């Protein structure tokens, strides 16, 4: 006992959860929801007709793209996946790279989002012969916004998109400033776009933002608007129900009392999983992922902010063994955590076992084992006071970011679309997953470095880079921000060229990167939960949209 009292732990005092037991109880209103679902189903039929009726009329193809854009931004595209794919395939087959309609930027963005590798050459139409952008575009807000959003679907080497981003951002910043008083609604719309482009937004947050904006458009479709509102609230009810289930599971672990050194961020972890997929058909996958992220957060704090080196070695070995028989070797406080990890994987194994997919958990377990090994390597470096080179650091840190583990884990429970080959692909860390890991690692390190320097902790990628290249922290941040933008371009490229993996699986990896952009663009909004994230959670999970 005396020996235990002498142990010096690198403990950190994280702020408690801001939610308490707010989401513990869920009131199910099935009868009322059934009526709403019936209305939604009828309205969906009309939208399907609207999409399909324009296919054979070339003069309507620009309007068709605008309709698809509205459907996507309103958050209801998941109802019309087949119709949208059929429409965009028809447009691609009809025009190839030679789009004849209006709004070429919109055409470019919508098709690239869908996985069609259309050429950016059409955007040269926005330029004069001397290479400058046309003056007429500088005051065309709609055209500027369309081009601005299109630039984020670029890949490495597409200089015209890089030039267009600089041009449109400069013009839009000026317009937003000029319109603050004369047209505050449009000014706010522009500022929201500049703050976070569509390509980096989570679908549910974009729906939340776009629904009131769409309602103010004189050209809005009243039926489409009502469908978006009703559907938003139906999904909110489902997500509340799921969060209630995860909340009760978390309450059973009682992390705040049993593992008080760890961040109590279960609600934020569910928000994270919700960002990866919001659709009803992925409900069980979402619940599992939320639990994994919640425990991964505790694992992170165990290795970073509490566990001593010898304890961490034992825990790492126990995870590699993955058996309840390993539990007796662990310190008392680690037993609850270890059992919690094993239990959620076993539970999911049983859930999907009836479909003959229990073996999918073996891939998820392997990714978790690798994740823990990366933590152990960082603990070893911290214990030895070793500052790795930038290259050494990133090789390990890409895994310790958790995103390669989550990219594999999030496939579990998604249904028949996930094959053994898809899991094997994810474990090879293909370019799109590497890019997502890069975004996660670099954004996290930029904002968490100062907090972590105050305790015994492995040197961050920022510190490794500063030491190796003898540069300032400010310089490293600039370099890392460019690397993050390059990683986004790599994600776009892979979504266009990788045809072996279904787009719904690619979207999970893209959405993981989008969550990072929401949580870490300005600060570590996950560890230090601020008003913005609280507002997001309240809007998505507490307050329904008025009909």
Swiss-Prot record:
A Pfam short name: Terpene_synth
Motif DDXXD motif in this chain: 300-304
Keywords on record: Lyase, Magnesium, Manganese, Metal-binding
Residues involved in Mg(2+) 1 binding: 300, 304
MF-aspect GO terms: (-)-E-beta-caryophyllene synthase activity; magnesium ion binding
Catalytic activity, reaction form: (2E,6E)-farnesyl diphosphate = (-)-(E)-beta-caryophyllene + diphosphate
Binding site for Mg(2+) 3: 444, 448, 452
SUPFAM superfamilies according to UniProt: Terpenoid cyclases/Protein prenyltransferases, Terpenoid synthases
Pathway: Secondary metabolite biosynthesis; terpenoid biosynthesis
Cofactor note (record): Binds 3 Mg(2+) or Mn(2+) ions per subunit.
GO BP of this protein: diterpenoid biosynthetic process
Function text: Sesquiterpene synthase involved in the biosynthesis of beta-caryophyllene as the major product and trace amounts of alpha-humulene. Produces exclusively the (-)-(E)-beta caryophyllene enantiomer.
Family that this chain belongs to: Belongs to the terpene synthase family. Tpsa subfamily.
Name this polypeptide is given: (-)-beta-caryophyllene synthase
């Amino acid at each position: 006992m005396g020996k235990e009292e002498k142990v010096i732990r690198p403990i950190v005092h994280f702020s408690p959860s801001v939610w308490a037991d707010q989401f513990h109880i869920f009131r199910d209103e099935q009868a009322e929801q059934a009526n709403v679902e019936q209305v939604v189903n009828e309205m969906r039929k009309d939208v399907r007709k609207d999409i399909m009726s324009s296919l054979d009329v070339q003069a309507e193809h620009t309007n068709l793209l605008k309709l698809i854009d509205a459907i996507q931004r309103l958050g209801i595209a998941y109802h019309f996946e087949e119709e949208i794919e059929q429409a965009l395939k028809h447009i691609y087959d009809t025009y190839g790279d030679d789009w004849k309609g209006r709004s070429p930027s919109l055409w470019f963005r919508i098709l690239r989002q869908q996985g069609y590798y259309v050429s950016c050459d059409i955007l040269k139409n926005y330029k004069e012969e001397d290479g400058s952008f046309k003056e007429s575009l500088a005051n065309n807000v709609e055209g500027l916004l369309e081009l601005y959003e299109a630039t984020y679907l670029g890949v490495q080497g597409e200089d015209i998109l890089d030039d267009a981003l600089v041009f449109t951002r400069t013009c839009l910043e000026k317009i937003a400033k000029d319109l603050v008083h004369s047209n505050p609604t449009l000014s706010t719309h522009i500022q929201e776009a500049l703050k976070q482009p569509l390509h980096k937004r989570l679908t549910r947050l974009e729906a939340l933002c776009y629904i009131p904006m769409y309602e103010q458009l004189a050209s809005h479709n009243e039926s489409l608007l009502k469908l978006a509102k009703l559907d938003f609230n139906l999904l909110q009810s489902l997500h509340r129900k799921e969060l209630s289930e995860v909340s009760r599971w978390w309450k059973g672990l009682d992390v705040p009392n049993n593992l008080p050194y760890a961040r109590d961020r279960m609600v934020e972890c569910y928000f994270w999983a919700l960002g990866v997929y919001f659709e009803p058909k992925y409900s069980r996958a979402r619940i599992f992922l939320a639990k994994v992220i919640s425990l991964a957060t505790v694992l992170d704090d165990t290795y970073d902010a509490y566990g001593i080196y010898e304890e961490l070695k034992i825990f790492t070995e126990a995870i590699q063994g993955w058996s309840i028989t390993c539990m007796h070797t662990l310190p008392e406080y680690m037993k609850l955590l270890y059992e919690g990890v094993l239990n959620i994987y076993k539970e999911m194994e049983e859930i999907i076992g009836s479909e003959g997919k229990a073996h999918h958990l073996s891939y998820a377990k392997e990714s978790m084992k690798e994740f823990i090994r990366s933590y152990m390597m960082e603990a070893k470096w911290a214990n030895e006071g070793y500052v790795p080179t930038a290259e050494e650091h990133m090789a390990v840190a890409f895994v310790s970011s958790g995103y390669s583990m989550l990219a594999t884990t999030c496939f579990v429970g998604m249904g028949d679309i996930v094959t053994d080959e898809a899991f094997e692909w994810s474990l090879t860390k293909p370019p799109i997953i590497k890019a997502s890991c890069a975004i996660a690692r670099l954004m996290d390190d930029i904002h968490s470095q100062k907090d972590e320097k105050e305790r015994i902790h492995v040197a961050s990628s920022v510190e490794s880079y500063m030491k190796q290249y003898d540069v300032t922290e400010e310089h490293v941040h600039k370099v890392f921000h460019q690397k993050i933008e390059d990683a986004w371009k790599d994600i776009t490229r892979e979504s266009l060229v990788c045809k072996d993996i279904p787009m719904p699986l690619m979207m999970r990896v893209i959405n993981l990167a989008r969550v990072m952009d929401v949580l870490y663009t300005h600060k570590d909004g996950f560890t230090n939960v601020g008003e913005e994230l609280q507002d997001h959670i309240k809007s998505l999970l507490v307050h329904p949209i008025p009909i």
